[in-house]
Each structure stands twice: as structure tokens, then as C-alpha cells.
């Protein structure tokens, strides 16, 4: 697909089936934009082209092509405030409908990205505008993208915007400078297995149930948002996140999210291996019965110990945790199978800072009532705290770190001033398989319902996550180096992202 074609996209896609249309739209990626002939000419002539300016240039030309097709002109209207042209959508070059994307080694003229006379702003002009966009305007553009991409994996545009982005799932690998399958540009397509018994389908079903549980029993009267689209990092254009759920956030009259200063982020984890059956021969069920009848730290430890790699690792103070489990504790009661641990050293300074920030945090445990005993009503049976905290060596910690950074930028540069501070949580959901004794229809609290196809929730562990400022800035700089390295490997004239983008701003929780 040509980013600069003057042929309306509706006409180009006319007559195509839905799968064919989806494939065509998926060609409008940041990678293909950087490989377009006119863009390569511009990058070759302007060796100092940087991000986030080039990312916003891409966004401008993308919505010049797809805005009318998707029936949303919000993004172009924001650009139009700065372009000085009557129609911000007239950025398409003269073309005959052929693709403007070519291989890196093809011969080409040195036009510097200029458009044909009378067509609209050329690439250098758009780049100059994007270089000077105020951060608040970048936030508005990025929030408009979020609104358009709600639905996440069910939304075709959501996957398009993830190209060239270090997302939450890729951030850990970027910080650790690992060469893995987490490719940033033209990534391998995500193969989603929605077979009902697959771990992915299980996780999606249970995630929706956990959102309802949190809204009913944790968030109370707070405004919650359970359908958040792609949130691009407005200041740098190389990071992006898709939140599972957030609280103290609202949707304004312009359909843009408004994060309050005391917003809350919830990252939900429902592991398939925690699922068990309500039958006598399932050893995990026997331990759950003890937990259900006598809710306490002791019965919780016994229940979790029945799971292979049971989420919580015992680590004495001054020792190095492994990367196996995403929760830690220094409470000796959890040390059921003593193992030797390596000592923390000065080389582990960032890890030490993270451990010190989180080691005194407590997790809240919610034991849920069994709907087979309560006529289908799921409520809180017991609530207590345990000395369990996040493992900063685990990839989940870095997922939350990036979510914190992106949302914090929106609070800093777009939200109205207010009291409070951004909070982050990781929520561990435990479920059991449905039994013949379970009602088909179950209610959650006073307003929520449980999907009849979903397993039965039995337990939630709510863990606060604290992120030191020094670890945020260090991680972002390392990840930006990874982005630059990946771009140099992919493109002959890549745009550049400066580490100075991450040197300012109050990032302290």
C-alpha cells in the first residue's frame, strides 16, 4: 500500500474480502513507511532526522490515508492546527496507485521527500512541524490513537501501531539487550490460538473476570477503564503499552482518556497452570479446601506449594532472587524447600534499589466464595495481607515499569493538576474448572456477572509495585540504545532516538 497515493483508500480496497482488506491495512506499518521511496530520500538528505518527530510524521501520513476510510478525523484535525493548510489530509503525493515501498538497494532520485506542486505539505515541511509540536499536543495525538485502537487484539489498527515500538512484552528483552524473537520492525505475526482449551483463550476469559472482581471489590466507586487501546509514549515515540485495566481515569467529551494524578494501573496475570479441578483426586483441590475453610497465611502457603513453580520464591535479605517466579518473600514460613542463594553484590545496584523499594510491601489476598454454596453469588469470603512483593528480576516487573513511565507522561503533560500519585499493581488470578454443582449463571458482587464459559475464580493476590526513579531512567536509556541498534540493522538511513529524551521529568512513584 502506498502512503502517498491520491486514490481514496475506500476505492483501493473496494471488492476485497475482509481477510484481504485486513492484510492490506497491515501494510501501513512504521517499517514500511521508513522504506517508502520518498521517505528514504528524505532520511538520506536529512541525516539528523530524529524520533519522536519521524514517528509523528508517520502518524500524519497514515491518517491522511486511512482517516476517511475509518471515519475518524480527530488525529488530522489536531495536526491541522499546526500545518497552516486548509486540509491536513492533502499530504498524498501524485501517484498512479503503485506502491511507494521498495527495497533498500534500489536506485532513486534525491528529491528529499518533496511532494508534487499543489498536492499538500511535503515531508520536510511535515517533519519541521512535528519537531516543534508541544508535548501536550503529542499527548492529544497519542490519546486519539488510543481511542481508535480500543479493543486491542480485536482491532486491526492496534497491531499496526505496535510495529517499531518497544512494547511491554518486549521491554525486558530491550533492557537486557537480548537478541531474541522480540523483533521490533516487521515482527513475526502473533499466532493467537483461541481454541477454548488453549492457555491464551483461558487467560483472556479469566482476565475479563478479574477486571469485574477488581471493579467490584477493590476499586469501589472509582472510575475504571477496562478497554484501553494502544498508548504510545508521547515524548519519544519508541515505547507503547496496552493496559489491562486502570482506575481514576475517565473519558472526556472528546473521547480522549484523562488520567488523574492518583490513577491506578492493574496488570493482570491468570496463569493456565494454576487451573485445577474440583475433584477429590486433584491434590491441589484438597489444599484449596483447607484454604477455603481456614483462610490464613499458612493454608495459602500450602495451597501455592502444590503448584509447580508456585509464583512465590523465598529469598533471604541480601540474597539474589532467580528469574523463575514473579513474586518474592523474605518470610521464613515460605521456605519449604531450602536452597542456596547467591549474594547480592555492588554489580546488582539497580536490583538492590528495586528490592529495597518493594521488600516492605504487603500483598492483599482475596479468598472468594464458592458459587456452588452461595446460589451463584461470588463475594469476598476472606481478606488478609501477606509479606509478598514483586520480583524485580522478573519480566513482569519491567512490563509494569514501562506502563508506569508512559502513563506518568500523560499525567505530567496532559492531565489537570491534582493530589495523589500514580500507583501500579500486579494482580494474580487463580481459577478452577467448572463443576456440575456450579450454577450456569454466577454474579460477582452487587453488579458484576461471570461469563458462563469462564472458569470459577477462587483467589486474587493484589501486589503493589514500587519503581525507583534511577531504575526508570537507566532502563529507558538501555532500551533506547536497543531501539537504535535494531533500526540500524533494519534500515540504511534510520531515524535516531536520543537518550536525552529520558533525562527529565518526575518519575518517582
Swiss-Prot record:
What EC number(s) are associated with this protein in UniProt?
A: 3.1.-.-
Q: Name one GO cellular component term.
A: host cell cytoplasm
GO BP of this protein: symbiont-mediated degradation of host mRNA; symbiont-mediated suppression of host gene expression
Q: Location of site Required for function?
A: 207, 244, 267, 269
According to its UniProt record, what is one Pfam family this protein matches?
Answer: Viral_alk_exo
SUPFAM superfamilies registered for this protein in UniProt: Restriction endonuclease-like (SSF52980)
Keyword RNA-binding among UniProt keywords: yes
Name the residue ranges with Basic and acidic residues bias: 90-104
Q: Which major enzyme category is it?
A: hydrolase
The record's region (Disordered) falls at 90-120
Q: Which InterPro entries does the record associate with it? A: Herpes_alk_exo (IPR001616), Restrct_endonuc-II-like (IPR011335), Viral_alk_exo (IPR034720)
Q: Which GO terms describe its molecular function?
A: DNA binding; endonuclease activity; exonuclease activity; RNA binding
Gene3D superfamilies linked: Herpesvirus alkaline exonuclease, N-terminal domain (1.20.120.860)
Where is this gene product found?
Host nucleus; Host cytoplasm
Sorted UniProt keywords: Decay of host mRNAs by virus, Early protein, Endonuclease, Eukaryotic host gene expression shutoff by virus, Exonuclease, Host cytoplasm, Host gene expression shutoff by virus, Host mRNA suppression by virus, Host nucleus, Host-virus interaction, Hydrolase, Nuclease, RNA-binding
Complex and partners: Forms a complex with the DNA polymerase, the DNA polymerase processivity factor, and the major DNA binding protein.
Its biological purpose: Plays a role in processing non linear or branched viral DNA intermediates in order to promote the production of mature packaged unit-length linear progeny viral DNA molecules. Exhibits endonuclease and exonuclease activities and accepts both double-stranded and single-stranded DNA as substrate. Exonuclease digestion of DNA is in the 5'-> 3' direction and the products are 5'-monophosphate nucleosides. Additionally, forms a recombinase with the major DNA-binding protein, which displays strand exchange activity.
Family listed: Belongs to the herpesviridae alkaline nuclease family.
Name the UniProt record assigns to this protein? Shutoff alkaline exonuclease
Originating gene: 37
Amino acid at each position: 500500500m502506498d502512503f502517498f497515493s491520491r486514490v481514496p483508500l475506500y476505492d483501493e480496497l473496494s471488492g476485497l474480502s475482509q481477510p484481504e482488506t485486513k492484510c492490506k491495512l497491515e501494510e501501513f506499518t512504521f517499517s514500511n513507511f521508513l522504506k517508502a521511496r520518498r521517505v528514504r530520500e528524505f532520511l538520506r538528505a536529512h541525516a539528523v532526522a530524529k524520533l519522536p518527530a519521524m514517528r509523528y510524521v508517520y502518524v500524519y501520513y497514515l491518517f491522511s490515508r486511512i482517516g476517511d476510510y475509518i471515519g475518524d478525523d480527530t488525529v488530522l484535525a489536531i495536526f491541522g492546527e499546526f500545518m497552516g493548510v486548509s486540509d491536513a489530509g492533502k499530504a498524498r503525493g501524485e501517484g498512479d496507485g503503485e506502491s511507494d515501498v521498495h527495497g533498500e538497494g534500489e536506485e532513486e532520485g534525491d528529491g528529499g521527500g518533496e511532494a508534487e506542486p499543489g498536492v499538500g505539505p511535503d515531508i520536510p515541511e511535515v517533519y519541521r512541524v512535528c519537531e516543534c509540536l508541544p508535548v501536550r499536543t503529542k499527548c492529544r495525538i497519542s490519546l486519539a490513537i488510543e481511542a481508535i485502537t480500543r479493543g486491542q487484539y480485536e482491532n486491526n489498527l492496534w497491531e499496526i501501531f505496535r510495529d517499531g515500538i518497544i512494547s511491554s512484552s518486549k521491554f525486558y528483552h530491550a533492557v537486557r539487550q537480548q537478541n531474541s524473537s522480540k523483533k521490533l520492525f516487521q515482527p513475526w505475526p502473533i499466532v493467537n490460538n483461541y481454541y477454548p482449551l488453549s492457555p491464551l483463550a483461558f487467560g483472556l476469559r479469566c482476565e475479563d473476570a478479574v477486571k469485574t472482581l477488581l471493579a467490584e471489590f477493590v476499586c469501589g466507586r472509582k472510575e475504571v477503564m477496562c478497554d484501553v487501546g494502544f498508548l504510545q509514549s508521547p515524548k519519544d515515540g519508541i515505547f507503547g503499552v496496552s493496559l489491562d485495566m486502570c482506575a481514576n481515569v475517565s473519558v472526556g467529551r472528546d473521547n480522549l482518556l484523562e488520567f488523574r494524578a492518583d490513577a491506578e494501573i492493574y496488570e493482570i496475570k491468570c496463569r493456565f497452570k494454576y487451573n485445577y479441578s474440583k475433584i477429590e483426586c486433584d491434590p491441589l483441590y484438597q489444599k484449596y479446601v483447607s484454604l477455603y475453610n481456614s483462610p490464613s497465611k499458612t493454608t495459602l502457603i500450602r495451597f501455592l506449594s502444590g503448584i509447580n513453580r508456585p509464583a512465590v520464591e523465598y529469598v533471604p535479605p541480601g540474597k539474589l532472587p532467580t528469574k523463575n517466579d514473579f513474586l518474592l518473600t523474605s518470610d521464613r514460613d515460605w521456605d519449604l524447600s531450602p536452597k542456596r542463594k547467591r549474594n547480592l553484590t555492588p554489580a546488582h545496584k539497580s536490583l538492590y534499589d528495586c528490592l529495597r523499594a518493594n521488600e516492605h510491601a504487603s500483598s492483599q489476598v482475596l479468598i472468594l466464595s464458592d458459587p456452588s454454596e452461595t446460589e451463584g453469588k461470588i463475594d469476598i469470603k476472606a481478606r488478609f495481607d501477606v509479606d509478598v512483593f514483586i520480583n524485580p528480576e522478573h519480566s513482569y516487573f519491567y512490563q509494569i515499569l514501562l506502563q508506569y513511565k508512559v502513563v506518568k507522561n500523560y499525567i505530567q503533560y496532559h492531565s489537570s493538576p491534582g493530589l495523589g500519585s500514580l500507583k501500579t499493581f500486579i494482580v494474580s488470578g487463580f481459577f478452577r474448572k467448572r463443576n456440575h454443582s456450579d450454577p450456569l449463571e454466577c454474579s460477582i458482587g452487587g453488579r458484576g456477572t461471570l461469563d458462563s464459559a469462564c472458569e470459577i475464580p477462587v483467589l486474587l493476590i493484589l501486589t503493589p509495585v514500587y519503581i525507583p526513579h534511577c531504575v526508570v531512567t537507566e532502563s529507558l536509556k538501555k532500551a533506547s540504545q536497543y531501539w537504535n541498534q535494531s533500526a540500524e540493522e533494519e534500515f540504511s538511513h534510520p531515524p535516531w532516538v536520543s537518550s536525552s529524551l529520558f533525562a527529565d521529568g518526575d518519575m518517582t512513584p
